[in-house]
């Protein structure tokens, strides 16, 4: 499985998990999208149906800052754009905030949902808080794991409705 990172150099280099993956040779820096493109603005939700894409072509993470990001940074990147369902950040910068995942967290979530749990856990060792993300989202990740897009959207809708009722 290949992991690619497109780096827009908008993050603090010391906190940038995409760059860390490249530095550790766990990902390859690229300017071209390949395989699954993790895109928080995509209409399509990642699901087990995307596993063949992961195996054949890999996954591309677009590393940018949540403070300065827009759809424009994603729309010109070729590949199969997918968004992740609701998950909560475990990183120290956005801890507990829905959808505001680091590049590493997005990668771990993708692997977990696509039933590559051992790989997700392997990547969680890259940073001190990696296991925090997995533990914080364990119930959600297990609910999404190995499910098709419709099932994941249904689960996500139920979770959001439950949160809004509180």
Swiss-Prot record:
Gene Ontology CC annotations of this record: cytoplasm
Enzyme class, broadest EC rank: transferase
Location, primary (coarse class): cytoplasm
Cited InterPro entries: RNaseL-inhib-like_metal-bd_dom (IPR007209), Tsr3-like (IPR022968), Tsr3_C (IPR007177)
Top-level taxon: Archaea
Pfam families listed in its UniProt record: Fer4_RLI, Ribo_biogen_C
Positions that bind S-adenosyl-L-methionine: 17, 62, 84, 99, 103
Catalytic activity, EC: 2.5.1.157
Compartmental location: Cytoplasm
Keywords in alphabetical order: Cytoplasm, Ribosome biogenesis, rRNA processing, S-adenosyl-L-methionine, Transferase
Known catalytic reactions: an N(1)-methylpseudouridine in rRNA + S-adenosyl-L-methionine = N(1)-methyl-N(3)-[(3S)-3-amino-3-carboxypropyl]pseudouridine in rRNA + S-methyl-5'-thioadenosine + H(+)
One GO MF term: 18S rRNA aminocarboxypropyltransferase activity
GO biological process, one term: enzyme-directed rRNA pseudouridine synthesis
Keyword Protein transport included in the entry's annotation: no
Job description of the protein: Aminocarboxypropyltransferase that catalyzes the aminocarboxypropyl transfer on pseudouridine corresponding to position 914 in M.jannaschii 16S rRNA. It constitutes the last step in biosynthesis of the hypermodified N1-methyl-N3-(3-amino-3-carboxypropyl) pseudouridine (m1acp3-Psi).
Alphabetized NCBIfam families for the sequence: PRK02287.1 (NF002621)
Family recorded in the similarity comment: Belongs to the TDD superfamily. TSR3 family.
HAMAP family: TSR3 (MF_01116)
Protein name in the entry: 16S rRNA aminocarboxypropyltransferase
Organism: Saccharolobus islandicus (strain L.S.2.15 / Lassen #1) (Sulfolobus islandicus)
Classification lineage: Archaea, Thermoproteota, Thermoprotei, Sulfolobales, Sulfolobaceae
